[in-house]
Amino acid sequence: MVESATVVSGPSPPPRKRLSRILFVLIGIALLVAIAAAVAPWAFSNAALRNEVASQIRRMTGLATLAQGHAVFVVLPQPHVSIDDVSFTDPSGSLRIDAHYLKGYVRLAALLTGRIEISSATLGQPDMRIDLDGRPMPPDSVIGRAADAAPATPEAASADEARLGAVTLVDGRARLISKHLSPDVTIDAINVTVDWRKPGAAAIVTGQAQIRGETATIAAWIASPVGLLRGQQSPLSLKIVAPSLSFSVDGGLASVPEWQFGGYIRAATPSLRAILEQAGYAIPLPGPFGDFEAGCDAVVSAQSAVLSGLRLRFDGNEFEGTLAYQARDPAPVLSGTLATNRLSLRPFLSGVPPAAGRDGQWNRDPFEFREVGSTDLDLRISAAHMLFSHFELEDAAFSVMRNSGRLELALAGAKAYQGAIKGRVTFDLGDTGVGMQATGTVIGADFAALSFDAFGWPEFNGSVTGTANLESSGASMYELMRNLDGTAQIDVAQGQLGGIDLESALHRIDKSPLALLAGIHRGRTAFDHASFNLRFVKGIASIEEGKLENPSLWLGFGGTVDFGERGLDLHAVAKSAADAAAPGKEVPDFRFDIGGSWDDLAFTPDVRGLIRRSGAAAPLFPQKRDAGKPVVPSGDAGQ
């Protein structure tokens, strides 16, 4: 027996829903039929499509269109016209675009009335040549009429409402030329959309491009492009982000009487020097300028820039202040005032060749000045703490001035080593070398700390005061030191001479002259005052009027310091103060020499004189005394 099966179906849709679906399908079919009917006049005519698209582009932008490839109208998924091998030019020749293809997307409402009205376009692989000094928009275009309309007039209001659209560039390339650019700038891999719906609306630019092999993300907003074309101002926002640069501006842009931006600028880059050198500019200061960050209020034009409220950081240094740049003939000038809590000059000196070579002698390599560029400088900098090589300064105020081939570094004043210093050095930079003039003053500085940081000599202490006035010339550091001329004066008060006990030597010189050599280096010699003068002639400084005094001791010294060959030849004689005050009287004295290379000085006592004073050895020598080289005339001993 076979039982019949009953099939139970689901509930049928309500009549209202079935009607809605039917209406939706019918409307879709009707819309497709309407579109098909509307595009029928264009579907079979390449010439008609090309002419209509060219006419609209000419009407909006003023650009002439030349289409050499196939033109086709595509309905789905979005109605658009596709044309291959198309070119655009403006009448003045300022702009030329050669694109692999053009896709013009049309407005649906216009299409239903039988018209093609392009709302946006895509250019594939456009190759663009842009003359930044030209005016590519003719006056009979939508943009040209809007630009020529007087502000706040009915004509301007009408022109501002005309339709434009959006343009997308896919894998494009642009060559920018201008009298201000040398060489031309090439931008590759351009994938950017420019959305400017009508002249009176804002323009938005977004996308990416490649400059010198590096991809940058670009985002820009211009509130009133047509205002700029009419000579008015417009708010502007721009941001560029790339591996080597992050840059943003927010402010206002004006086009009359010249292009000028006013607003806030932020910039950051791993190497400012590399960025500027790629752009054809040289930083007129040494140093890597790495880890650069800056933020400031700025007024920037083609010929000048003023950066105020500047916060600047690079190479581990941070500054606040103002900078200004002015393009002028024969050289531009960078000026400003900066302040910092801590300034290290080590990064600025990192690329400077060492003064001395590995052999311990002065560097003979010729000076190179090409990296400093041609920009003139007028910079004034104050630093609460400044580190220069091994020297530490406080409350330093200095300036860097450059005018043509002359560079001047001036330290107006600073606290250092419990004293004060100031100085000035001027370099005249030439093709065959450099001329130098230097002056300096130190007042009341700690001689122990200063001599250790300067020369690595810990044997001296006291309060040092001195002046120097020097000049030289040469093509290398070696020549510069060999040609030193000038004078210097040094005074030291309330000090000690380490590594030698002269008072003990004088006390023992008659009793045990030979035995004193064993212990002379174990003590120190205190003094109330010491002084000497230096007279430089061709790199050799004569030590003049050298003396060291305390109530019981007088030391006279003289000799030469060879700055060219880094050598010292010093001769000294020590006497008791009472004996030194009695010229002509034969009194015990202790004589010694210090000589050799600066890096390996040798202390040499007058051994022959000590042996002569020894009673056991006296018969071995002539009775006429010859104790060595006199340092000062006996008549000057008490002076």
Whereabouts are the PLM-identified features?
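N-terminal leader/targeting segments and the immediate start of mature chains
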Residues: M60, D359-D376
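N-terminal Sec-pathway targeting helices
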Residues: P14-L31
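Intrinsic-disorder/low-complexity linker and hinge segments
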Residues: R145-D160, P353-D365
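Terminal hydrophobic membrane-targeting helix
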Residues: P15, A34-R135, A294-A298
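A structural feature that tracks compact, well-ordered secondary-structure segments
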Residues: L310, T322-L323
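Long, internal scaffold/assembly segments composed of regular secondary structure
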Residues: E318-E320
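N-terminal Lys/Arg-rich, disordered targeting/topogenic segments
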Residues: M1-L19
